[in-house]
Amino acid sequence: MRKSPSKSQTKKTSQLRKTAKKSNTFEFGVFDLAIPPNITEPKNLKDVRTKWIPFGNDNLFPQYLAELKRKSSTQRSVLAQKTVFTSGAKFVCRDENLEKFIEDINADHESLRDVFKKLADDYYTFGNAYMECVKYDGGINIYHIDATTVRMAKSKKEIYVNSDWCKYWNNDEKMHRIPIYPRVAHNKFVMHFKDYEPTFNFYGLPDYVAALEHIENGNRSTKEICRRRK
């Protein structure tokens, strides 16, 4: 769950106008809209006290995007359609051995399409996707890593994975590191997928980042309209 907005965050207000049926008077409802501040990355890494790079001022920008996706039916529908169109129905090949592999690519018995769909979902939702590969004698297992749990190391050579960045952001025991390809450690490595974004060296951004305020405003307006109709 995303933390409550800090005092430093800019609060904006939106007004809904309702016209009375039997008069010319207007009724106004006012409520706060807390939009995350401009998303930036640290310019001077010496000022970053952690070994990983925060994503957002409170390091919870991915968590905010995940929550926003759950609150907005339109946003969720658009992202879901893009994911489905990208992942397709299945992967097809003519090699029998390869076909067996793409139908069962990890210890969780997921297919390549299952993992690819999760990666596409994260890519469109967060602007970042992380694929973990685990080598073993005779083959390799491929997994998806939830993008909300990942933060990039300052060295750009590994990632930090934490199940709950709200509680354990400073607890080394609650997070583990995985090297980024081509580095390999303990037969594991990660591949990071993102698009180029000016002034961003560690993370990508989703395409809809410029519309965050509009999405949030739409959610709040819809809730206010529904409340007034009760």
List each model region and its residues.
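Structured, contiguous alpha/beta core segments that scaffold functional sites
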Residues: 2-74, 79-230
